[in-house]
């Protein structure tokens, strides 16, 4: 008897699973807010140099740029005065007395003057946040395998609540970056534990639906953020607003049960049995739960218990050929998705459209995108869906090269389409990755995959700097990498309607069966080929 069959006995999709998925999904609303928070807390408004204290405030005091507006980073050394020598009339200097910002919003940019020579610090703040997610992946992955999924989930909620709230009271940009780094670390812990606890407590037949439901919560979070940002124009209060709720989520997480697979593989059979019986009671199958015994769990999951005695680590992802292929292809797909997604999602200001409206549109496209994704992964399969989502996104990004900046509507439409494809790609990847790696390596595999997505999101701002050389270079890089990620997906195994692999041997057997299935039609076709006679009758 497999774990899936044991889950069927206690209720594979009953009231427990609905409440379980709900408790895991609600905090994802806040994760979306944190990931995209700097769209609003780090907005760069129109600005120009503050004139010297003794200068007139008339517009002519400031030099004008090519667009007829005051220069953002320069001012005249001397006030225009006919009595000055001609060679000093047009002399300019940097903004020695600060800047004037044409905005009612209070952001980290306006508070710490992250403009002109300091404008790269704004991008650095976002990169530091992504670095936190990058570091948090392997750290919390290892801690989760050692101490369990549930305690790491709870502590990650607390860390995000504490560090996010502390960031709201930061006295300097450096302190702000430190707390944002910790926010990123905690988000990795939440994401990884949520994915594992979802797929391990939900039956195979509804796994795609539950995963997409959690993905939709991220979409709803994208709707909530612009409304919240519009209502709370002060960045400190906005930062505090999106962080405080995680104190409540940490309390609710105590109800979430530990992964049965982890309990069994860790030798905690009595706790695993009590957890299953509690689930059975909640699902109205108390009698079935009482029939289960520790001996039955040990007997039916003996294969898993034996494999648990062997310690697995990062090197095991490359030990056998099929795992090397899975790791390489998934890493490329994750990198491409994170790389391109955050180049579009964090570039809302670049399209010349109201950022509140455009963020709602960017969030809204996820609804049809994820709905189409769930239909596709449920009927066409994970591999085809993953491949085509990335290829379509790559085509949309490359198409931006040929659309002039004056055609804002078309450029925005292509960006929205590409972002929708990449959102669907994330939804598919979270499910696909958890299904491809065996239980003994699932958390490690998810951690490595998460790392590559975050590496991509960290590199994306640096790639945008290449646009100073030629405007089309960033889109060439983003689009090409996305096409490569989509192509890699076609080299993976299909997981549609298959139980989760428990051990490395399971995925090896699965790979051999797939090869054999492909070879049989070819052999049959060859055997049916009849050579033509060359002689006469």
Swiss-Prot record:
One of its GO terms (molecular function) is prostaglandin transmembrane transporter activity. It catalyses: estrone 3-sulfate(out) + glutarate(in) = estrone 3-sulfate(in) + glutarate(out); estrone 3-sulfate(in) + 2-oxoglutarate(out) = estrone 3-sulfate(out) + 2-oxoglutarate(in); taurocholate(out) + glutarate(in) = taurocholate(in) + glutarate(out); dehydroepiandrosterone 3-sulfate(out) + glutarate(in) = dehydroepiandrosterone 3-sulfate(in) + glutarate(out). The modification Phosphoserine is found at residue 4. Disruption phenotype: Mice appear healthy and are fertile. Exhibit a loss of taurocholate, estrone sulfate and para-aminohippurate transport in kidney and of fluorescein (FL) transport in choroid plexus. GO terms for biological process: monoatomic ion transport; prostaglandin transport; response to toxic substance. Expression inhibited by androgens such as testosterone. Glycans are attached at residue 81. Its main location: membrane. Expressed mainly in kidney. In kidney, detected in almost all parts of the nephron, including macula densa cells. Expressed (at protein level) throughout the renal cortex. Widely distributed in the brain with no large regional differences. Expressed in the choroid plexus (CP, located in the ventricles of the brain). Expressed in developing bone. Weakly expressed in brain and eye. Pfam families: Sugar_tr (PF00083). SUPFAM superfamilies: MFS general substrate transporter. It is a multi-pass membrane protein. InterPro entries: MFS_dom, MFS_sugar_transport-like, MFS_trans_sf, Orgcat_transp/SVOP. It comes from the Eukaryota. Residues 33-123, 172-176, 234-236, 349-354, 405-411, 493-537 are extracellular. The chain crosses the membrane at residues 12-32, 124-144, 151-171, 177-197, 213-233, 237-257, 328-348, 355-375, 384-404, 412-432, 472-492. It is found in: Basolateral cell membrane. Keywords: Cell membrane, Detoxification, Glycoprotein, Ion transport, Lipid transport, Membrane, Phosphoprotein, Transmembrane, Transmembrane helix, Transport. Residues 513-537 are annotated as: Disordered. The keyword Membrane applies. Functions as an organic anion/dicarboxylate exchanger that couples organic anion uptake indirectly to the sodium gradient. Transports organic anions such as estrone 3-sulfate (E1S) and urate in exchange for dicarboxylates such as glutarate or ketoglutarate (2-oxoglutarate). Plays an important role in the excretion of endogenous and exogenous organic anions, especially from the kidney and the brain. E1S transport is pH- and chloride-dependent and may also involve E1S/cGMP exchange. PANTHER family: SOLUTE CARRIER FAMILY 22 MEMBER. This is Organic anion transporter 3. It comes from Mus musculus.
């Amino acid at each position: 008897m497999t774990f899936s069959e044991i889950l069927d006995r206690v209720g594979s999709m009953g009231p427990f699973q609905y409440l379980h998925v709900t408790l895991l999904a609600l905090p994802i609303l806040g994760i979306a807010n944190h990931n995209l928070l700097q769209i609003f807390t780090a907005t760069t408004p129109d600005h120009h140099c503050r004139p010297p204290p003794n200068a007139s405030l008339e517009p002519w005091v400031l030099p004008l740029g090519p667009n007829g507006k005051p220069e953002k980073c320069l001012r005249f050394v001397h006030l225009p005065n006919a009595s000055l020598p001609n060679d000093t009339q047009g002399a300019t200097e940097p903004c020695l007395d600060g800047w004037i910002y044409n905005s009612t919003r209070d952001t980290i940019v306006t508070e710490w003057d992250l403009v002109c020579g300091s404008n790269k610090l704004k991008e650095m703040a976002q990169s530091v946040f992504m670095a936190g997610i990058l570091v948090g992946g392997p750290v919390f992955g290892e801690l989760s395998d050692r101490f369990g999924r549930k305690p790491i989930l709870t502590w990650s909620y607390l860390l995000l609540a504490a560090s996010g709230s502390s960031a709201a009271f930061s006295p300097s940009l450096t302190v702000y970056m430190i707390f944002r780094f910790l926010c990123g670390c905690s988000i990795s812990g939440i994401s990884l534990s949520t994915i594992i606890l979802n797929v391990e407590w939900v039956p195979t037949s509804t796994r795609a639906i539950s995963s997409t439901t959690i993905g939709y919560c991220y979409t709803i979070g994208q709707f909530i953020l612009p409304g919240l940002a519009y209502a709370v124009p002060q960045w400190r209060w906005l930062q505090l607003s999106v962080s405080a709720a995680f104190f409540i989520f940490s309390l609710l997480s105590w109800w979430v049960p530990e992964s049965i697979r982890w309990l069994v593989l860790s030798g905690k059979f009595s706790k695993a049995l009590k957890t299953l019986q509690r689930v059975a009671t909640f699902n109205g199958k108390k009698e079935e739960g009482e029939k289960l015994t520790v001996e039955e769990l040990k007997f039916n999951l003996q294969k898993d218990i034996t494999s648990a005695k062997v310690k697995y680590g990062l090197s095991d992802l490359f030990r056998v050929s099929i795992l090397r292929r899975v790791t390489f292809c998934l890493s490329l797909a994750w990198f491409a998705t994170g790389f391109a997604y955050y180049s579009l999602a964090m570039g809302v200001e670049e399209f010349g459209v109201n950022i509140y409206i455009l963020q709602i549109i960017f969030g809204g496209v996820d609804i049809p995108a994820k709905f189409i994704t769930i239909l596709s992964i449920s009927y066409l399969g994970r591999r085809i869906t993953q491949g085509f989502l990335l290829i379509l996104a790559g085509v949309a990004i490359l198409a931006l090269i040929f659309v002039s900046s004056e055609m804002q509507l078309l450029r925005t439409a292509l960006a929205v389409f590409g972002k929708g494809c990449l959102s669907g790609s994330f939804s598919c990847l979270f499910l696909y990755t958890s299904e491809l790696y065996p239980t003994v390596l699932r958390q490690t595999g998810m951690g490595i995959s998460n790392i590559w997505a975050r590496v991509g999101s960290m590199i994306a701002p640096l790639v945008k700097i290449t646009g100073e050389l030629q405007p089309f270079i960033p889109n060439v890089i983003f689009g090409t990498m996305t096409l490569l990620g989509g192509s890699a997906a076609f080299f993976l195994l299909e997981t549609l309607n298959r139980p989760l692999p428990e051990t490395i041997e399971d995925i090896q057997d699965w790979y051999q069966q797939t090869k054999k299935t492909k070879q049989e039609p070819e052999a049959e076709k060859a055997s049916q080929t009849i050579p033509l006679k060359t002689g006469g009758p």
